[in-house]
Amino acid sequence: MPASCQHDKNVGRILHEVTYGKATLCDIACEGPVKEKSAFFYFFNTIIISLLSIAFVASLLDYWATSEGKEAELKGRTAWRLLMSFSVPRNTISIFSIRQDPSALQCLDAIRWISFTWVASLHCNMYTADGDNMLQYIRESDYFFSDIFLNSYTSVDTFFLISGLLVSFSFFKLAQVRIFENNSEKTLFRLTPAYILFIGFYIVWTPRMHGVWAIGNVQNSTSFVENCESTWWMNALYINNINGAVDMCYGVSWFLAVDMQLYWIAPIFLLAIFYSCEFSRVYHFRTRVLELILVGIFLSMAAIVFLTAYFDLPVLPVTAKDPGNFEYVNLIYMKPWTRCIPYLAGILCGYLIVQVREKTIVLRKPQTWMILLAWIVAATLALTVVFVVYDYVRGASDWSIATRALYGCFARIGWSIAVGWVILACTFGWAGPISTILSHPLWYPLGRLSYCAFLTHWFLIHLLLDGDDRPAHFVSLWHTYLTLTVPVVFLSFIGAYCWSCLVEIPFGKIE
């Protein structure tokens, strides 16, 4: 209802009477007045204006120094280098450069973009479903290929696998613990300012939108902002996934918390593998790298089985019979002990790539039929993970607790094997045209912007839905993809470019 109904207690009675008693109203949510500007509003906007001013001045001075030939004279000065961290032309070149370290894993940028688009489609579909006709969203589960969207939760595991792979790859490539500690500091200093400042942006500017989406049933931006005002410090410490999904600040931030928590425990496995390799060289015993990874995976599987059995949990957050199971989200979906399977698989992939490149492990190129067989197996695993839940999602079959627990375990293992094979095949030259496509330089800028795109896309979904003059109306999954997901992805990368130039890259250079 519009703001004029804020204090009108007769609205419910009037609507009941005009429908001749046929309408039963559970609740009436009034849009209410726009939130008053607080001291934090002015404080935060002062920070943003200051950053914009510094970037503007730095860009002008960069242009002046380049045109006047002063660059060589100034580049050795610390103050100049700090100021140039905010130069928009330089940061733009850093983002859109198609040059990359030859030792880098070039297929990852494309995989990041594909996974991000899949995640964005998941969120867009969920949020439009939280409108005036959620039953239509549930009916979509009757179509077999709808599982491409309805079971796109696996795309998140791709990000965890990539995170584990990059941590492992950089660690074993450098093979020095001290350098790993320095990289940890760099990671925190590069990611955290962009993250926390965007939380501030969300707190300040979301109430200014305050459209129909501010009073959604589940995805309620008003309550999310209130959560952020009281629990933002948990986001800063990367422990916000302790809160439930309803009480959490900025709905997609749980991923960053879990990713950082897995990053904190990664040294346990990295150091164990590293020192076991060192001892094996000195004392000539076989390194048990795979066994170390399998122990971690087994413990994660045990946690999934226990939680699923004890709390009688489903295998997905949304099904036809259970449109929103927050217990599953809070106990399994947002917790590191269930997400470490793809992360550990990524650590194993990173270790293997480094060892093969350094010729510590010698891999002979498999025969063509073996490579084709591996691709078939990987594709079969990925398709099985996505589509095997078809009957379960649409409510046509009830899975036993054992079946649900096994799917929760082996779906993550199967997906990790499939994605891990794609990365290894592209790296070792076993992917043919697939590697040519995934490793194309045009993917590099999109990969560099994927972090900030992930930060901005959730806010942009709220922005676009709040810009409408009525509640969200779900038509179909493909309709939502074309009318909301595509615009959100496009605008997310525009927003990511701005946020990366203004915050992420400058603070990374300053560190």
Regions found by a protein language model. Name each.
Residues 1, 175, 230-254, 265-416, ...:
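Aromatic-enriched alpha-helical transmembrane segments of multi-pass intramembrane proteins
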Residues 1-110, 115, 122-156, 160-163, ...:
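Exoplasmic/lumenal regions adjacent to the first transmembrane segment
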Residues 50-54, 114-122, 190-205, 295-303, ...:
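Hydrophobic alpha-helical membrane-insertion segments
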Residues 50-51, 335-349, 370-505:
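Alpha-helical transmembrane segments of multi-pass integral membrane proteins
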Residues 53, 60, 117, 196, ...:
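Generic alpha-helical transmembrane segments of integral inner-membrane proteins
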Residues 57-113, 169-193, 264-296, 348-380, ...:
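Helix-loop boundary elements of multi-pass alpha-helical membrane proteins
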Residues 89, 135-145, 222-247:
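Extracytosolic (periplasmic/ER-lumenal) interhelical loops and adjacent juxtamembrane/interface segments
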Residues 122-127, 163-172, 202, 262-277, ...:
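Membrane-interfacial alpha-helical segments at the cytosolic side of multi-pass membrane proteins
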